[in-house]
Amino acid sequence: LFEHIYMETILGYDSTNLISLNWVALSGIILGSVFTYYVFALRKWKYKTMTVIAFSAITGYLMYFYFRIDYDLPKEALALPIFLRSFGYVIIAICFLTALSRVPFQHFFEAVSVQAFVSAGFGSVLGTAILGRALNVVMKKNAILLSANLDHVNPVIGYIPQGALYGALQQQALMVTMKELYGWLTIIELSCLLLFMIK
């Protein structure tokens, strides 16, 4: 959700640039699948180890965007976080689907159906709804905070057209909001990673 908003609204990339980044995501998926096959299937690493590796990759993705988000980030700089995200997601998906192989046969199809429903249908919609709501609420808060000095008393504001001023305010509020939300997601991800490492 945030990636596309950032790339389209802030960086101004068109559909061709966005689609070209899918090759990076595909390479992350392929490398993550090969890595998981080699170390999880052949070398028999544990679920916990694989989950920690996957969450570390996703944490790297979130931290990269938190620390590097900017108005003039080149397209090439987006390759690493997109690769890390795809790499981590495919490891999580493979590990969770493999965990279902331990379910007894009479309940296997129910378990696969529930997992597919949650991951493909319910999970993405719920995640998008929560992040969309958080984006709206935090964006309004940041727009109010950033516009505190934008009144007729400020002499600099009188020389800037209202439309340009409002557009710059909205763009800056969006940047601050995305940075704030990436920060909160990073904290949540680090907490989950710490829980996995402790247990």
Question: Where do the protein language model's features map onto the residues?
Answer:
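Perimembrane helix-loop junctions in membrane proteins
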Residues: 13, 139-143, 196
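Hydrophobic membrane-targeting alpha-helices
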Residues: 6, 99, 133, 193-197
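Transmembrane-helix exit segments and adjacent C-terminal regions of multi-pass membrane proteins
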Residues: 161-199
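Hydrophobic, membrane-facing alpha-helical anchors
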Residues: 5-6, 10, 26-36, 161-168
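C-terminal module of multi-pass small-molecule transporters
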Residues: 22-149, 182-184
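Short amphipathic helix-loop junctions that connect adjacent transmembrane helices
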Residues: 2-18
